C-alpha cells in the first residue's frame, strides 16, 4: 500500500510541476535572448538577424500534427499575408526535428518558419512553462528593437494565438 501511495505522490508531483530548469519567464518589455536554430529546410535562423528589420511573431507549441497545434499553425497560415503586409516574420518553435517540421510544413502548406529546438533550449530561455508532461504553448510578438510587446499564453486555444498576435501587429503598423 505504501508503494502505491509513494508512486501516486511521485507521479502527481511531476504531473503538476510547471517545468524544470527554466529561466525567468519573459514578459512584455523584456528583450528576447539571442538564439540560433535550424528551420524546416536546414537553414540557420538567427534572431539577431531580424533586429531593426522585422517584427517577429514567435510561437512555441508542443507537437507537430497534434490537433490543437495543427489548428494553430493553419490559423497562422490562413492569415500569413496579413502578417507579411505588416512586416512580420512568423516562426513556430518546438523540439521536433528538422525533418519532422518539413513533413508538417508540406502536409499543411505552411508558408512560415518552423524552428527545431532540440532539448527545448530556446523555450527555456523564454521561460515557457510545461503543462503537465507537454511543452507549453505561448506566443510572443517582438518589435524591431527586440523587445516583447505582447505575450499570449493559452494551452488549449490554438487559433486564438494567431488572432491575438495579429491584432497587436495591426495596431503596431498603424
Could you describe each region identified by the protein language model?
Residues 47-71, 76:
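Short active-site neighborhood of thiol/selenol oxidoreductases, capturing the structured segment around
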Residues 135-174:
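Thiol-/selenol-based redox modules, centered on thioredoxin-like
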Residues 6-15:
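Bacterial N-terminal signal peptides
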Residues 20-48:
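N-terminal "domain-start" segment that seeds a small globular fold
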Residues 1-4:
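Positively charged n-region of N-terminal signal peptides that target proteins for export
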Residues 70-108, 119-124:
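Structural microenvironment flanking redox-active thiols in thiol-disulfide oxidoreductases
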Residues 32-33, 55-57, 136-138:
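Short loop/turn microsegments at loop-to-beta-strand junctions
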